[in-house]
């Protein structure tokens, strides 16, 4: 099983790229994990945000691995504790499918992308910059994998 984080947005600043690379390296023992950055749709004065979201959606769909289990990060999605995420990760491993975690653009996911999601996950009620969400997802996947492996990283 492999995991892919498909994130709509600009190229990550160095501090995000460095943090992501650190968790990606740590996760590599248990779960190969890659980042795919999706170019954001054009927004601004006189531009249609709906069209930008639809354009992003087409690019996200094209980046999905075949037969992947799709988890869309979405504000109204299900909130999981770290322990619950570890249980989900074990369940997903049992399915034998690759995973795709999706971070949408400023207006969220297109209806087409939302319809493809096998489940929706919310980081929580806080509003976070999408770049920070990349790090939170990477860290929480590492924490979940460490819990499954009885690694001492997680101490609750």
UniProtKB/Swiss-Prot annotation:
Binding site for S-adenosyl-L-methionine: 73, 104, 123-128
Compartments it resides in: Cytoplasm
Enzyme Commission identifier(s): 2.1.1.177
InterPro entries: Alpha/beta_knot_MTases, RlmH-like, tRNA_m1G_MTases_N
Gene from which the chain derives: rlmH
Catalytic reaction list: pseudouridine(1915) in 23S rRNA + S-adenosyl-L-methionine = N(3)-methylpseudouridine(1915) in 23S rRNA + S-adenosyl-L-homocysteine + H(+)
UniProt enzyme class: transferase
Family indicated by similarity: Belongs to the RNA methyltransferase RlmH family.
Complex formation: Homodimer.
Main location: cytoplasm
GO CC annotations, alphabetized: cytoplasm
Protein name: Ribosomal RNA large subunit methyltransferase H
Keywords (A to Z) from UniProt: Cytoplasm, Methyltransferase, rRNA processing, S-adenosyl-L-methionine, Transferase
A single GO molecular function term of this UniProt record: rRNA (pseudouridine-N3-)-methyltransferase activity
Stated role: Specifically methylates the pseudouridine at position 1915 (m3Psi1915) in 23S rRNA.
Pfam families recorded: SPOUT_MTase
Superkingdom assignment: Bacteria
């Amino acid at each position: 099983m492999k995991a892919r984080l498909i994130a709509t947005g600009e190229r990550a600043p160095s501090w995000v790229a460095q943090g992501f690379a650190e968790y990606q390296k740590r996760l590599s023992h248990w779960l190969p994990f890659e980042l795919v950055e999706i170019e954001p749709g054009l927004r601004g004065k006189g531009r249609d945000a709906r069209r930008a979201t639809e354009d992003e959606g087409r690019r996200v769909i094209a980046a999905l691995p075949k037969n992947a289990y799709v988890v869309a990060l979405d504000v109204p999605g299900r909130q999981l504790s770290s322990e619950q995420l570890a249980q989900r990760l074990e369940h997903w491993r049992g399915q034998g499918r690759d995973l795709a975690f999706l971070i949408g653009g400023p207006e969220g996911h297109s209806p087409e992308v939302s319809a493809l999601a096998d489940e929706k996950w919310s980081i929580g009620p806080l509003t976070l910059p999408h770049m920070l969400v990349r790090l939170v997802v990477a860290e929480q996947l590492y924490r979940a994998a460490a819990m499954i492996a009885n690694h001492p990283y997680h101490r609750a």
